[in-house]
Amino acid sequence: MTTLGALVILYYPSDAQLDALGAWRHACDALLVVDNTPQPDARAREMCAREGIALLHHGNRGGIAGAYNAGLAALFRDRIDAVALFDQDSSVPAAYFPAMRDVCAGLGRRAFLAGPRIFDENACSFLPELSTNGIGLRRLHIEPGAPLQRCAFLISSGCVVSRDAFDVLGRFDETLFIDHVDTEYSFRALSRNVPLYVVPSLVLPHRIGAKQRHAIGPFEMTSMNHSWQRRYYSARNAVQLGMQYGLRFPVAIVPNLLTVWQVVQIALVERDKRAKLAGILFGVADGLFGRLGPLERTRPRLAARAQRVQQG
């Protein structure tokens, strides 16, 4: 029988998020919680000890990519066949693990990634499921009862990584740290002919950013309201994706078009314009010159100044 594990990443979790972990223990074949908070969270340690849940403290080394790598390596060492990735705020439907276990059993010992449809609760709409020929993008028409559908990109939340896929694709890129980590992995899968599938029967609710709608005359604009640090990582890593994959897959330039749209959003409707636009500018520059890794390494003075402001 196919064994399906779950990997949950914590980062300054709330009490409610910690309490929710207890329900995961019997839903999957193996549960590993990675505490990615810089200093070990005593509440997480106590809760996991009480519930008999395996806990690994990783301390945000390598960002979200590092946490995924540490957790996946540990679970695959325990001979788990496939692992589902989750954020601490993921709301997992009861049908998720039985359905994904059937998907894994059907695909057998093959390299693959599979994920549910993602319903963005902020936008009250599904994220678009896309296919690509490397040059253009095409939106897929997904029917709820349809079989597995090949796609080009999956976000990490709810995504199942098979053991063979991890063997073929390797570790997530820790130099990216956070934003576009899953986008890069999708491009890597595309380049190595590892299939990605969306499971039409499964829907995972998810909140992306702190979206707000703004009226500008007769028009409406949506803003994400990410911090300047996230703007930095997003812009920098988008440049890296374009440089790394753009010649083979011109569609890898698209994340940079999203950066341009972020500039428009910030300039028109968001607060902290100066800091966010500066973050994007620094990110583009560092992406072009290959300065990767955490902000503390690439822009230590900027990171230190932000830390002082945060501490008051």
Put a short name on every predicted segment.
Residues 7-27:
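Short, well-formed alpha-helical segments that are part of the catalytic scaffolds
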Residues 22-57:
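Acidic donor-binding segment of Leloir-type glycosyltransferases
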Residues 58-75:
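Glycine-rich, basic loop-to-helix element that forms the pyrophosphate-binding segment
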Residues 80-91:
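Short beta-strand-to-loop acidic/aromatic patch adjacent to the donor-nucleotide binding site
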Residues 95-128:
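Conserved donor NDP-sugar-binding/catalytic core segment of glycosyltransferases
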Residues 117, 132-152:
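Short, flexible, basic/aromatic active-site loop/helix in glycosyltransferases
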Residues 159, 165, 169-170, 175-202:
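A short, conserved alpha-helix in the catalytic core of glycosyltransferases
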Residues 243-312:
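Non-catalytic, C-terminal membrane-associated alpha-helical segments of glycosyltransferases
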